């Protein structure tokens, strides 16, 4: 069954599915979204990960150490050229650390902004991820230091 919509709509749906399965912690679905060929991934602050094994291991590690994560995607832009598509977005992330052993309550929630580029390739099974690159959005120095004193 071929999904309805334009290529750009199908790529945007694949991009959304990527983040939704991360939120659910669905490793099998996440794995199915990636191509079988050589893939690459850069998480914020991580080195370049190359190859299906390294990339998928990184997501297994993230899922194992993140009790709660939610992505609010903004500034989503998709462009398609032939069998390759580029999706860029801002990941507005809300995540929670491990639960407190005594209370069982989720650790403090932390917000983070990441800009991401996801590269998709058209396959017989639909659009699949070829590369993901996420970079942290650093706070503007003017916002952090309103009095102009940069010596901390």
What are these language model-derived features?
Residues 1-33, 40-152:
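A beta-strand edge to alpha-helix "cap/lid" segment located at domain peripheries
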